[in-house]
């Protein structure tokens, strides 16, 4: 289990409160699909993913990205119990979707980049470290069923 300090929790929740989940979620998933094109195989029913502009403009990518980032909201509400929070999603991604758990880590790293671009100077080294810790812990929780 990962322990978050009061300062880390404050850094995470402060930024999260300012986040446009719909915009950032679509951008994060879209960038994942562009930068790591092999991840597109999990989204073959999303239509046109033939180019970066097609991916970033794809309404299904944006909608699913919002859904993914909304689940990060659950992580923020339950930072002290991520394994339980993501148990069902871990099972779904492992047993039904067969998603390589490495993809969770990649998406987390993309999310940190999105945060940095959206929040600029507010995204201090301390804030970055707290978010990196969170996305890493979420990736581990999502990959739990694989072990």
From Swiss-Prot:
Heterotetramer of two alpha chains and two epsilon chains in early embryonic hemoglobin Gower-2; two zeta chains and two epsilon chains in early embryonic hemoglobin Gower-1. PROSITE patterns: GLOBIN (PS01033). This is Hemoglobin subunit epsilon. GO terms for biological process: hydrogen peroxide catabolic process. Keywords: Heme, Iron, Metal-binding, Oxygen transport, Phosphoprotein, Transport. Residues 3-147 form the Globin domain. GO terms for cellular component: blood microparticle; haptoglobin-hemoglobin complex; hemoglobin complex. It comes from Pithecia irrorata (Gray monk saki).
């Amino acid at each position: 289990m990962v322990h978050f300090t009061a300062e880390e929790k404050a850094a995470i929740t402060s930024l999260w409160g300012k986040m446009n989940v719909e915009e950032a979620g679509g951008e994060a998933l879209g960038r994942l699909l562009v930068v790591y094109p092999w991840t597109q195989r999990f989204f073959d029913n999303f239509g046109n993913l033939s180019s970066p502009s097609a991916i970033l403009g794809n309404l299904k990518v944006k909608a699913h990205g919002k859904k993914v980032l909304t689940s990060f909201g659950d992580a923020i509400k339950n930072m002290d119990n991520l394994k339980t929070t993501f148990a069902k999603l871990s099972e779904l991604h492992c047993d039904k979707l067969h998603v390589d758990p490495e993809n969770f880590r990649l998406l987390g790293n993309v999310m940190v980049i999105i945060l940095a671009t959206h929040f600029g100077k507010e995204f201090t080294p301390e804030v970055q470290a707290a978010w990196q810790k969170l996305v890493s812990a979420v990736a581990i929780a999502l990959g739990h069923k694989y072990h």
